């Protein structure tokens, strides 16, 4: 007859109680490690501590990223009534302007995967801080462009340095959260993009009144003043963004053990073996990868178009000059409010 200890050690993952979780000791093989327990309350406290350190900072980073990539849409028509808008002063046609927008996405597609590789090798806090400072400086540089080739080249560089952020943040969350915990947190971060759209319109309206200050057109001030926060915030990210649970100084030894156990099955680790060719082939031949690709393509096409052309569309509806900038705020504000429905969808998917 099995002893209580033997029974406890034979408990499978399917038999876990809601208030008692199984824990694997750090450094041990998950198939052979002896099992210990931790309570649901301990786990909730750990997740809450992680949320407070990671989510607000990650959302703020993505907010600045999206603000800097989409503000060219505001600059295109800012002070167009006096011919001090970006398109008029750089003497670009509508077709050329569209090409300048397109090259951003080309660079974005090329550099996403390499950037994620570097994020793991160089540590998340260091790599993301570097990306932030770089895209902030490049955004400021857009304020100094005066020709179509210059705009196109700078936009390509912007796409190169922004490419790794969102997929990098999604990958970064796998170091800290179980699979079922990630969707609501990704949604929280992604929602900051719509908030950036609302703030972008309001900021463009305010900065539009700076036209001619120190001899610079308002659209140049727009790039300078919206790129600067990314550069400055990079220093905060360098020191404040935690890299991995096993190294975060704010976690106790007990909390690190719980974190290790939580992620033993479906989390990512700081150190792991390289992907084999067989694993790479299995991933690339999985139809679900391309299904997700098609879905995201369908979502991104209209979303990217709206983020870049909403000011132009609004102006075409008859709103005049700076008023067109202000009228881009309500749609994004409503969209941000609707993002609150994501937790409900997560609960429905579990039912």
State the predicted function of each range:
Residues 61, 128-134, 138, 154, ...:
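Residue-level signature of the transmembrane alpha-helical cores
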Residues 73, 278-344:
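Extracytoplasmic gate region of multi-pass secondary transporters
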Residues 109-151:
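Conserved MFS/SLC helix-loop-helix module at the cytosolic interface between two early adjacent transmembrane helices
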Residues 2-80, 88:
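Cytosolic juxtamembrane N-terminal segment immediately preceding the first transmembrane helix
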Residues 2, 42, 48, 179-194, ...:
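Central mid-sequence intracellular linker of multi-pass
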Residues 101-117, 329-342:
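Central cavity-lining transmembrane alpha-helices of secondary-active solute carriers
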Residues 51-94, 110-111, 115, 164, ...:
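Extracytoplasmic
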Residues 75-96, 120-122, 140-152, 160-163, ...:
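Extracellular/lumenal inter-transmembrane loop segments of multi-pass membrane transporters
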């Amino acid at each position: 007859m099995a002893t209580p200890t033997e029974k406890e050690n034979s408990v499978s993952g399917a038999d876990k109680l809601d208030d008692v979780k199984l824990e694997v000791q750090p450094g041990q093989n998950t198939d052979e490690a002896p099992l210990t327990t931790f309570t649901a309350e301990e786990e909730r406290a750990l997740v809450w501590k992680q949320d407070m350190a990671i989510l607000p900072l990650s959302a703020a980073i993505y907010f600045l990223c999206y603000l800097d990539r989409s503000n060219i849409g505001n600059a295109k028509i800012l002070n167009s009534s006096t011919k001090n808008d970006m398109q008029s002063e750089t003497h670009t046609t509508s077709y050329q302007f569209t090409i300048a927008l397109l090259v951003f996405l080309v660079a974005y597609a090329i550099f996403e995967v390499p950037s994620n590789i570097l994020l793991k090798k160089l540590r998340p806090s260091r790599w993301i801080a570097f990306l932030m400072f770089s895209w902030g400086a490049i955004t400021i540089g857009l304020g100094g462009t005066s020709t179509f080739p210059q705009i196109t080249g700078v936009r390509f560089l912007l796409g190169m340095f922004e490419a790794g952020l969102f997929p990098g943040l999604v990958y970064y969350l796998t170091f800290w959260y179980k699979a079922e915990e990630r969707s609501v947190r990704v949604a929280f971060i992604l929602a900051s993009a719509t908030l950036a759209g609302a703030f972008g319109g309001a900021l463009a309206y305010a900065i539009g009144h700076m036209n001619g200050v120190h001899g610079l057109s308002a659209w140049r001030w727009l790039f300078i003043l919206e790129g600067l926060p990314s550069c400055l915030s990079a220093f905060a990210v360098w020191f404040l963004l935690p890299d991995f649970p096993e190294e975060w100084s704010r976690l106790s030894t007990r909390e690190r053990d719980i974190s290790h156990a939580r992620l033993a099955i479906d989390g990512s680790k700081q150190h792991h073996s390289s992907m084999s060719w067989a694993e790479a082939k299995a991933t690339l031949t999985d139809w679900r990868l391309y299904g997700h690709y098609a879905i995201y393509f369908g979502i991104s096409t209209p979303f990217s178009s709206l983020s870049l052309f909403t000011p132009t569309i609004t102006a075409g509806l008859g709103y005049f000059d700076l008023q067109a900038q202000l009228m881009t705020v309500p749609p994004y504000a409503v969209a941000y409010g609707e993002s609150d429905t994501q937790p409900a969808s997560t609960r429905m998917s579990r039912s």
